[in-house]
């Protein structure tokens, strides 16, 4: 497979395909039949008789006709809505509700010194995006948590466009240059910049700076503003339970993202995908397991230098 410079989007959803919804519209037509009355015709017979002629009186007859119109009630077909986790598509059990909290984005380092990272397998969605000479992750949490999560690194202006559909997400990062700081502050993100929330972050472990900056999702979620409007909306369309997605079967996907080489291999044992980076198995430090996911989406797109 020839290497291409795509942006990889990793979705931790149980199922993820484009679904078509068919809406049936039933139209009811009412028809009316019109009937007529036959008038009886009488022919009088007159005989000449000797009589006194009585005065003739003419009486008017009025007939009232009533009309009844029947209108058929419209028929509506309502499609059953399957309740799901908004970012994974996992079907909820009866009476279960998604967590009443916003999406949380954590920018995670992918420098070789930063591996293995903490929290990639616990995220609902992980976006991998190109930065200078490598890649960086935007791990999105809603239904799961990670303690700790990191190493946390700086943001980019591309994060605003990439993550704009998450409905005012919390944005945890280590900061950026003045232009990026201003762009994030002016976006609809809830900016959890360390200068504003110094107590949320700490240096830990034996890695050199800047690859040792961590937090926990519990602490970051606790910084949600009291007037926040709540959980994210459903981000993708999913197949219904029991349906099979379309497409062609593949067992691996290998590609270049700037200086990084990324490999995803399908594993029948977990019925999902396992990751390798630069020829080595990629692990999550929290559990020691390989970084894995249920669905991998690879988007090939152009990159250009940011004005920030």
Set out the residue ranges of the language-model regions.
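Residue-level detector of alpha-helical hydrophobic segments embedded in or interacting with membranes
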Residues: 1, 43, 50, 69, ...
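Generic low-polarity alpha-helical segments
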Residues: 1, 25, 64-66, 297-298
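Sec-dependent bacterial lipoprotein signal peptides
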Residues: 1-30
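Short linear motifs in intrinsically disordered/low-complexity regions
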Residues: 3, 38-42, 290, 296
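Hydrophobic multi-pass inner-membrane translocation pores used for secretion
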Residues: 9, 30-31, 46, 71
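Bacterial signal peptide processing site
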Residues: 32-36
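Extracellular mucin-like PTS domains
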Residues: 41-80
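A surface/extracellular/periplasmic glyco- and lipid-processing/surface-interacting theme
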Residues: 77-127, 132-308
